[in-house]
Amino acid sequence: MKVAISDDFLLAFSDVQKTHQKKVREFIELFRENPEAGGIQYHPVRKARDPNLYSVRIDQAYRAIVFHPADTDLYLLTWVDHHDDAYAWAERKVFRVNPMTGALQVLAADAVEAAEAAVIVSKKAAPARKAGLFRKVKDDVLLRFGVPVELVPTVRAIDDEEGLEESREALPQEAYEALYLLAAGYDADTVLRELEKPMEPVAADPTDFTTALQNDDSKRRFVVVSDAKELAELLNAPLDLWRVFLHPKQRKLVSVAANGPYRVLGGAGTGKTVVALHRAKHLVETVFPASTDRILFTTFTRNLATDIHENLKTLCGPELLSRIEVVNLDAWVSNFLKARGYRFEPVFDGEGNELWENALALAPPETGLSSDFYRQEWDEVIQPQGLSSLDEYLKAPRLGRGTKIGRAAREAAWPVFREYRSQLTERGKREYIDMIRDARQLIEKQGIRLPYKAVVVDEAQDMSAEAFRLIRALVPAGPSDIFLVGDAHQRIYRYRATLGKCGIDIRGRARKLRLNYRTTDEIRRFAVTLLEGRPIDDLDGGLDDQQGYMSLTHGPKVEVHRLKSLADETAFLGRHVKDLIASGAAPESICIVGRTKHVVEHVKDALRAASLDLYEVKREATDKRSRPGVRVATMHRVKGLEFDHVLVASANDKIIPLEKAMKAGDDVVVARNAETGERALLYVALTRAKKSAVVSGWGAMSPFLG
């Protein structure tokens, strides 16, 4: 017998009253063991349009709805609810195998009947109407995209994008996505490739529901439950659908048999991190299954590493998780070097500033070079290239620098850099990029063999070239060795790198995710305009764009509130959060974001003044959803998180962009990059929102807001 659970069932289970969940859970466990057990009584749903739907009694209040085709051993748990509500749900649904795609689809019975009735009416008299949105698309193409034959008339009646949105609930998800892309101007072949559809038509048996469950589109909404452990994991976190249900394109990337490093790009909300998490699980479970095999999952910040580890705990069992090491790269380097007697410690900003002041005392005034120039030259030229002598500096390219200097100026400037390096050494200090370089050189010179079979990298856009060289040294070159996901539109740190120049060859192994499943189109559009006209790299020497990057949901436009004073903003924040909660939003689904810690303190004061509970998501701490309260965090901290509602507070001039971050002296290139980074930070903050985004400020507002 084959038992499966739908995504709808899990969502419905999460809404079951706590006093009944234990009873429902006991029923599900019994059902998985044997759906034909004597204690399970099946009752046909009398008014159901689908004869394969049955009601099963759980207790006096609750009923489960089961799809069980006659003469099969297939049992699908599709819904759970109070008695009358469960029956009403079953009466509204029909289950079909799409003969053109092979997917098991759940359709609204009313929509099917309405479409069939419309065909009858249209045959009697065809009233004049506007040309349809899909008038140029043939029926067989619509069917190949997953449009049920019964709903082709519904699609033909769609006149514009608003009509398409109104028809969304009636259509299978894969059909809606294809129609959305067609409406956006993509040709049929491009849509087939983007959605991982076969280029040739598929002939499927419409009565074979068991085979249909294996279809990639079916796996977006149904999961076959094979054992009690897997079932328990599902029921423990029924709302974490990302753990089980993947888009076919995501599923393909997760299991790709890569003959070397692989790179995945994608805008905010396209599921890059979800792909990386599932990829790590796939690697230890399938590609490198030996008990001694290890995978390194790394990212740029401790915050993200903490969040990733928490997510992997929900995705992997203890045995698999024990073979995935999750750590941000700087921490890995520190641990690696410390274990080998490394005598240097990382230098932090306060110490570094003092050392720079000492070194700048050697700067010759005749060159006219500012103190900002020296620090930027160090960060942009000397450190990325690992320059350690004047001779190397004289020969080094200075790509990306706006201030031109000749040989004489380089010779005059070098003593400053040499002195800064000398002072670091005297105090037993190194910058992190030096430590990364030292770790790589130690591995290469001593031939150290590390236990890792593969490395998975999240937020790759924030890694430096030296970091990528180290990553290349961590694992031997071979199939499925390195898997990177990133998006340079979300680069909020200064590093840039070209993978190919770091020994990571991704030629022929690079893909892009374009469908945003998190953010509404209104939020996406607002965020995208922040970076329009700015060249964004693809991590490998080329340019990336957001062509085809689109959201499949809609909602309210982003609101910008320009208040007169700090007191006015304080009152507004409290009032707006209360309005969201009154409309049904959970406080934990709301996050107020600030550019600086000072702004975060202002937000906390505003929430306290409104008598609202709050929970600050701090650095190196996870967002524990069990903790009550409106979330408050810095822009940097919310990277990698998501919320239903996001408010960006104090979007004032000199705060966004932050005045300190914009200091670039006379270097126009550094200034442009700094502004792009500040714009990217606001882009990241806004795209954490799933349903609504609001920006507020007082006095002079951020120039980014127009």
Where do the PLM segments sit?
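Active-site-adjacent loop/helix micro-motif of nuclease/hydrolase catalytic cores
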Residues: A86-R92, S371, E642, I655-K660
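Short amphipathic alpha-helical boundary/capping segments
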Residues: A12-D15, D240-F245, A359-E366
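Conserved helicase motor core of SF1/SF2 NTP-dependent helicases
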Residues: R243, H247-D293, F300-F344, F348, ...
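Coupling/switch/interface segments within P-loop NTPase motor domains and analogous charged loops
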Residues: K136, G146-P198, D349-R430
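Accessory N-terminal region flanking or inserted into the helicase ATPase core
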Residues: F209-P248, S255, Y262-L265, L369-K453
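A short, compositionally biased micro-patch
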Residues: A48, R57-A61, P69, N516, ...
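Basic, Lys/Arg-enriched alpha-helical interface segments
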Residues: M1-Y62, H68-N215, P397-G400
